């Protein structure tokens, strides 16, 4: 598809769908959005109000949010969409039927991007009768309007034109897309999170560290560096910089890391009732007094400040800005 994308259909407006709506509206796009859940439309309006300060950073709030329609029959409106962002439940049979419906009613060539967080699109295109080559994964991180990352994951039959359309579109709305060259369950970032979380659960449930100190070990340590340069560049910097620095780091720390890996695998979190109970007990102590509304508000504020600071640095800015 070569035409400009001006209208996006959002199918499913849970937290992810609502975040996409805020992002697309902030960029002046028209949004047609639908969700069968009772109360979904009111929830969407409330989410827009919560995101008022973000939207006001891009223009007049009332003007921006007037550019969407909540509809109950999305199929009858799909022909108007230049791109479709699907956010249905992570249930395979449901996803297959939904994607087939989107494929049936979408205009030829219109990309159908799924926000699936772990199911590869090759698993839910079987019922597509029109054109499965335009289906791919466009997986965001929550909240989509704040965190730039989106993982673009084509299935083996996805056309290169559809991939390029998705990549260019996400860049145009301020996202930082990454392209996966092969499908893997969970994609990239969720696999990284799973590896870190599983080790975190193991350390906490074994009584080695509290949940509170585990979070501090990330937020006051490597998490700060990873947010700026990522694990690979951080390793290279630790070895003096450049590809040679990465190689030196691997040679110097490789034997020790392999030893840690043996211990990590030996004590990996087994999801047993005993381990789960110990983990939950520490989490209760750590998080019981947290004021969650305040935490979310402050998190989003600092996140925006961090993104703005990174954007000013040539080596850390996103290609299209955010």
UniProtKB/Swiss-Prot annotation:
A molecular function (GO) term: NAD+ binding
Record EC number: 1.1.1.-
Top class in the EC scheme: oxidoreductase
InterPro entries linked: 3-OHacyl-CoA_DH_NAD-bd, 3HC_DH_C, 6-PGluconate_DH-like_C_sf, 6PGD_dom2, NAD(P)-bd_dom_sf
The keyword Transmembrane helix is annotated on this UniProt entry: yes
Chain positions of site Important for hydroxyacyl-coenzyme A dehydrogenase activity: 139
The keyword Cell division belongs to this UniProt entry's keyword annotation: no
UniProt keyword annotations, A-Z: Membrane, Oxidoreductase, Transmembrane, Transmembrane helix
Transmembrane segments: 5-25
GO biological-process terms attached to the record: fatty acid metabolic process
Cellular localization per UniProt: Membrane
Gene Ontology, cellular component aspect: membrane
Active site as annotated: 151 (for hydroxyacyl-coenzyme a dehydrogenase activity)
Domain of life: Eukaryota
Effect of deleting the gene: Does not affect tolerance to 2-benzoxazolinone (BOA).
Topology with respect to the bilayer: Single-pass membrane protein
Cross-referenced Pfam families: 3HCDH, 3HCDH_N
Induction: Expression is induced in response to 2-benzoxasolinone (BOA) exposure.
The family this protein is said to belong to: Belongs to the 3-hydroxyacyl-CoA dehydrogenase family.
Function: 3-hydroxyacyl-CoA dehydrogenase; part of the Fusarium detoxification of benzoxazolinone cluster 2 (FDB2) involved in the degradation of benzoxazolinones produced by the host plant. Maize, wheat, and rye produce the 2 benzoxazinone phytoanticipins 2,4-dihy-droxy-7-methoxy-1,4-benzoxazin-3-one (DIMBOA) and 2,4-dihydroxy-1,4-benzoxazin-3-one (DIBOA) that, due to their inherent instability once released, spontaneously degrade to the more stable corresponding benzoxazolinones, 6-methoxy-2-benzoxazolinone (MBOA) and 2-benzoxazolinone (BOA), respectively.
PANTHER family: 3-HYDROXYACYL-COA DEHYDROGENASE FAMILY PROTEIN, LAMBDA-CRYSTALLIN HOMOLOG
General remark: Fusarium verticillioides possesses 2 unlinked loci, FDB1 and FDB2, necessary for detoxification of antimicrobial compounds produced by maize, including 2-benzoxazolinone (BOA). The FDB2 cluster arose as a duplication of the FDB1 cluster with rearrangement and expansion by incorporating additional genes.
Name of the protein this chain belongs to: 3-hydroxyacyl-CoA dehydrogenase FVEG_12628
Organism (species): Gibberella moniliformis (strain M3125 / FGSC 7600) (Maize ear and stalk rot fungus)
């Amino acid at each position: 598809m070569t035409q400009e994308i001006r209208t996006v259909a959002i199918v499913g407006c849970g937290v992810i769908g609502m975040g996409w709506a805020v992002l697309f509206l902030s960029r002046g796009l028209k949004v047609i959005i639908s969700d069968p859940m009772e109360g979904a439309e009111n929830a969407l309006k409330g989410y827009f109000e919560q995101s008022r300060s973000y939207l006001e950073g891009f223009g007049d709030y009332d003007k921006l949010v007037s550019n969407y329609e909540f509809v109950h029959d999305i199929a009858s409106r799909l022909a108007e969409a230049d791109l479709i962002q699907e956010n249905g439940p992570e249930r395979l049979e449901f996803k297959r039927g939904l994607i087939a419906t989107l494929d049936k009613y979408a205009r030829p060539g219109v990309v159908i991007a799924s926000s699936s967080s772990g199911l590869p699109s090759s698993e839910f295109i079987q019922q597509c009768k029109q054109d499965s080559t335009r289906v791919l994964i466009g997986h965001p991180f929550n909240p989509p309007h704040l965190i730039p990352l989106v993982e673009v994951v084509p299935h083996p039959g996805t056309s290169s034109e559809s991939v390029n359309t998705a990549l260019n579109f996400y860049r145009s709305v301020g996202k930082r897309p990454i392209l996966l060259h092969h499908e893997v369950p969970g994609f990239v970032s969720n696999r990284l999170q799973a590896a870190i979380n599983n080790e975190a659960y193991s350390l906490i449930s074994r009584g080695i560290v509290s949940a509170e100190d585990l979070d501090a070990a990330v937020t006051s340590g490597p998490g700060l560096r990873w947010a700026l340069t990522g694990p690979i560049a951080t390793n290279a910097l630790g070895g003096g910089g450049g590809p040679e620095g990465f190689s030196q780091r691997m040679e110097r720390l490789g034997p020790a890391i392999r030893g840690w890996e043996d211990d990590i695998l030996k004590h990996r979190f087994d999801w047993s009732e005993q381990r789960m109970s110990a983990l939950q007990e520490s989490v209760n102590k750590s998080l019981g007094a947290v004021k969650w509304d305040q935490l979310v508000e402050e998190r989003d504020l600092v996140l925006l400040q961090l993104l703005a600071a990174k954007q000013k640095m040539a080596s850390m800015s996103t290609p299209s800005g955010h």
